[in-house]
Amino acid sequence: MNNLLIFLLLALIISPNYGGRNQNEFEEPDQSQHSHDSLHLRQRDHIHRTLRYDRPNPATHNQILEQLVDVYQRTIQPLEDAYHYNDLPERNDLSVGQIKANPLVLFLGPWSTGKTTMLNYILDTDILRTGAEPTTSEFTIVSYDEKKKSTEGVVLVSDKSKGLDALEKYGQNFLERFTGVGLPHPLLRRVTFLDTPGIIENRKQQERGYPFNKVVKWFIDRAQLILIVFDPTKLDVGLELETLFKQLKGKESQIRLILNKADSIATQELMRVYGALFWSLAPLINVTEPPRVYTGSFWPYEYKFNSNSALFKQEEASLLQDLNDVIENRLENKIALVRQHATRVRIHALLVDEYLGKLNKQWTFLDNQENVIDKLLQSPSEFNIFKGVQTKNNISPFDLPSPSVYRDFFSNNHMTDFKPLSQHCGYFSSCLMDQLDEAISTKLPALLAQANKQKHFSESRDEL
């Protein structure tokens, strides 16, 4: 609730002449700028300045990215394939396309809260359709292209280089509600945005004709920044929004709450709405530090109530800085993502190997093999399968999946189809597990150090 206390204090001291710490960062339009004044548009130079549209990637950026892909293909993917990691019912898959893809910024929230308008504002475009009624019925991915173009979902998932091919599993009805928009905007060379259908509390998921929540979860798992946008005039926290926040568990550090259209209500009402928002969301966000809330009006026009304009400008500057941090840290985040994925693949391979070891130990020619397998799957604790993997490999119990995951996994992959880890060793090459361990402990940390060095060099050059 620290954010609320700070906001209340600011609201009490703000006046039309208020000048905050970042006051000079936003200058009022000069009287000579007739084009802005006549249309009542706000200046947007601060967006360009904060996000550094035209700043090219450092020369070493692509080199580090290619090295990361090489580590994945040589040391992680072989174990993925050997133990059918992608057949796990609960997993975060990874592909070369996803590694090379720009960081993803995801817009979520109830209908008509200004998600699409906010995206249009950041990109200085009106190509994405907006309106008072629900207008976004599609998942729209906005990325760079040499010219303005629209791409159907079927085409998007067929191009593996985009890292979206896994979405094909959600069916034709979803693909008809999935579209891509390409724009020749320099910011899109460095980041990709996803606009989503607004949540309507009285609409059942089944009416959409595709697994909406599963699709949202797929994008949540791959997003580096998640903006959840609210309208202060209609806070509606119901079952649909509750489901969304359940899907966001574990991603709290990437969530930003946006109280949009804040200039449409007076200061006292805004204070009440701010408190009501936290009160409504408190049961859904079980973390010590609540997500940051940004209050403002994220569209190109002048604020309606000028008394809070300085606060809104500072809030917008902070949000833009958050977005810029995601862009600037994209290499470090990619390396961390691949290392996390490698750890999951390692745990999976160790568990399959442990199941195989117990099967070979328990099964004799006098036993029915299927009965032994069933016993292992139904009562893994009796054979210390998960406990054995945990203690022998120094793995946290919180990193181990549920035994039910492996009941599902082995129902589609017969246990005897796999070889023990000891048999995945070459005569002239090291074992697959040894290669993976080296990637986790040595190669990926070395790449991270290289990326940090590149980042510090770029920042030092910018200061000159």
Regions picked out by a protein language model, each given a short descriptive name:
Residues I228-P232, L257-K261, G296:
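Conserved beta-strand segments of the P-loop GTPase G domain that flank and frequently precede/overlap
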Residues D263, Q268-P445, A451:
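C-terminal end of P-loop GTPase domains and the immediately downstream helical coupling element
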Residues P16-L106, H456-L464:
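Short, flexible boundary segments at extreme N-termini or domain junctions of P-loop NTPases and their
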Residues Y53-P56, T60-H61, E66-Q98, W111, ...:
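Switch- and interface-adjacent substructures of P-loop NTPase systems
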Residues N2-N17:
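Cleavable N-terminal signal peptides of Sec/SRP-targeted secreted and luminal proteins
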